[in-house]
UniProtKB/Swiss-Prot annotation:
Organism annotation: Mus musculus
Keywords, alphabetical: Membrane, Signal, Transmembrane, Transmembrane helix
Segments on the Cytoplasmic side according to the record's topology features: 109-197
InterPro entries per record: Shisa, Shisa_N
Protein name: Protein shisa-4
GO CC, any one term: membrane
Length: 197
């Protein structure tokens, strides 16, 4: 066996430093959030330098005892969902899907109703033709024209000037109404055409 020199002690020193330095490397490890046995939520917290997270899945604290150490990987494993959490998430997902499905159904039903109504309205006018002829209408005078003013200039859209005001016809005869007391009533009931009826 060759004599142990400076080369032989180097690997041994590295192993010793690793074993003794492991707790120091693990020190200052944070405790993640957790739920205790009652289901109460506790926020995560930082441990001071040269201490690390200790305890169980349901209770955590900072310490220097390596036997009580709970690694970050073990802490994340503790975060596995409980049956209550899974049931809550499942019911929330089902409720969300139900709301979305109901909204989509209501939207589609209203669209179908409006489409059918439009089709019915179009089918009623399908065979009818509405003549669209451009018959010019005479302009309506707001005030009677002054006979001293002369003929009015032609209106835009009309070829000829208006011929003047329409003649006024009397709707009722001039003077007091004619009343004849001996005249028969305006409506006479029909007389029976055969006797005894």
């Amino acid at each position: 066996m060759p004599p142990a020199g400076p080369r032989g002690t180097a690997p041994l020193a590295a192993v010793v430093l690793l074993v003794l330095g492991a707790p120091l490397a693990l020190a200052s490890e944070d405790c993640l959030w957790y739920l205790d046995r009652n289901g109460s939520w506790h926020p995560g917290f930082d441990c001071e330098f040269f201490t690390f997270c200790c305890g169980t899945c349901y209770q955590r604290y900072c310490c220097r005892d390596l036997t009580l150490l709970i690694t970050e990987r073990q802490q994340k494993h503790c975060l596995a969902f409980s049956p209550k959490t899974i049931a809550g998430i499942a019911s929330a997902v089902i409720l969300f899907v139900a709301v979305v499905a109901t909204t989509i159904c209501c939207f589609l039903c209203s669209c179908c109703y409006l489409y059918r109504r439009r089709q019915q309205l179009q089918s009623t006018f399908e065979g009818q033709e509405i003549p669209m002829t451009g018959i010019p209408m005479q302009p309506v005078y707001q005030y009677p024209p002054d006979p001293k003013a002369g003929p009015a200039p032609p209106q835009p859209g009309f070829m000829y000037p208006p011929s003047g005001p329409a003649p006024q016809y009397p709707l009722y005869p001039a003077g007091p109404p004619i009343y004849n007391p001996a005249a028969p009533p305006p409506y006479m009931p029909p007389q029976p055409s055969y006797p005894g009826a």
